[in-house]
Amino acid sequence: MSPKTETKASVGFKAGVKDYRLTYYTPEYQTKDTDILAAFRVTPQPGVPPEEAGAAVAAESSTGTWTTVWTDGLTSLDRYKGRCYDIEPVPGEESQFIAYVAYPLDLFEEGSVTNLFTSIVGNVFGFKALRALRLEDLRIPPAYSKTFQGPPHGIQVERDKLNKYGRPLLGCTIKPKLGLSAKNYGRAVYECLRGGLDFTKDDENVNSQPFMRWRDRFCFCAEALYKAQAETGEIKGHYLNATAGTCEEMMKRAVFARELGVPIVMHDYLTGGFTANTSLAHYCRDNGLLLHIHRAMHAVIDRQRNHGMHFRVLAKALRMSGGDHIHAGTVVGKLEGEREVTLGFVDLLRDDFIEKDRSRGIYFTQDWVSMPGVLPVASGGIHVWHMPALTEIFGDDSVLQFGGGTLGHPWGNAPGAVANRVALEACVQARNEGRDLAREGNQVIREATKWSPELAAACEVWKEIKFEFDTIDRL
């Protein structure tokens, strides 16, 4: 090559494989306010130093590849590369480390959770030098979060739409989740809403199966909620699941829901995908629909302590992609969820500003600026005896969802709804009077049974039901 045509890439180029840590481990780096920060739990293969493992994560999730390439010289790696800037051992784990990685903002497309995850939790998770890798947390800077619409409406707008304040909202997933005809399904919806619930819900795997096509379900559920509204004088809703095999079909279902005049639709955001979810969230804001989000498939990703991605990351991603509700575990029910960890990501969903707090699994201070909050939904194996704990743990800005705990009532669906509404009102009143629900909760429920035979019957049925298993995902 003549000197006149010599490129920058040819200057100092040396072919071959080099240690990642020579380029991507930078303990002297001072993070910028605009950097996206990640905390990875890294388990290196035997013989791989933690600095090399952390640098490999930074490289493979940003600009690096397995060998030196000519085209490195055609760009500014110092501007675009991810940097492993700190490594700390995990207490009690001999071979695990927390690697902190900083990513320049220019690596990511604006307003795209899909692009963000494709880089940060992409091929690097299959890297052979690592036995396991888990993304524990992300810090999303305001410079990036402001490129997202976020939730279609948020907590305050939802309360204003429903005209319901000062208490958690009550819901119920219709059971059996599969097999009912559309008319029988709508009947169950009506009975639950008439009994005092605010919402009923399609189960996550109810889409448009042969036993109940989506259009029939939408029509019967709309009829049910309008009838219940007329009889109770309260605004009601049913989460109509718009999830479908294509984005076009999903949007068609959302459009039909809007034409029916219902207040809320639903999406399975992990199985449906972030691109579909963000599209639906934009439609919901533009057309006045609330958006309920189910997290089906999350445990495949987040349940193991050493590999995958913690749910707090999925929760942050959902807040950016868009949703007004999201299932967040119960702490006390049948599904996985340790109290402090759960409250950590519940705050990340609801609050504007969340301080770093390692005792709750929050690795970074997060400032959402003006992005609306998301209501956490407690659902899964809960019943009236859990009501005091749920009210105390989740507070007013939440949805408490009882499926079997409503429809399993010995007297029927409407009495099951009455029992839950009475239990909730009793707990809220007791709390407002200054009583300690954590200590006096059972007594509050027993007192309420004296003036609600429906609640008394529910308490008798579920007095021995417990789900006492150790939580897998602990700090």
From Swiss-Prot:
GO BP annotation list: photorespiration; reductive pentose-phosphate cycle
Coiled-coil portions: none
Gene Ontology MF terms in the entry: magnesium ion binding; monooxygenase activity; ribulose-bisphosphate carboxylase activity
Pfam families: RuBisCO_large, RuBisCO_large_N
N6-carboxylysine: residues carrying this PTM: K201
Cofactor entry: Mg(2+)
Positions of Mg(2+) binding: K201, D203, E204
Amino-acid positions noted as binding substrate in the UniProt annotation, renumbered to this chain: N123, T173, K177, R295, H327, S379
Catalytic activity from the UniProt record: 2 (2R)-3-phosphoglycerate + 2 H(+) = D-ribulose 1,5-bisphosphate + CO2 + H2O; D-ribulose 1,5-bisphosphate + O2 = 2-phosphoglycolate + (2R)-3-phosphoglycerate + 2 H(+)
Record note on cofactor: Binds 1 Mg(2+) ion per subunit.
HAMAP family reported for this sequence: RuBisCO_L_type1
Family stated for the protein in its record: Belongs to the RuBisCO large chain family. Type I subfamily.
Subunit-level organization: Heterohexadecamer of 8 large chains and 8 small chains; disulfide-linked. The disulfide link is formed within the large subunit homodimers.
Additional notes on this entry: The basic functional RuBisCO is composed of a large chain homodimer in a 'head-to-tail' conformation. In form I RuBisCO this homodimer is arranged in a barrel-like tetramer with the small subunits forming a tetrameric 'cap' on each end of the 'barrel'.
Name of the protein described by the UniProt record: Ribulose bisphosphate carboxylase large chain
The encoding gene: rbcL
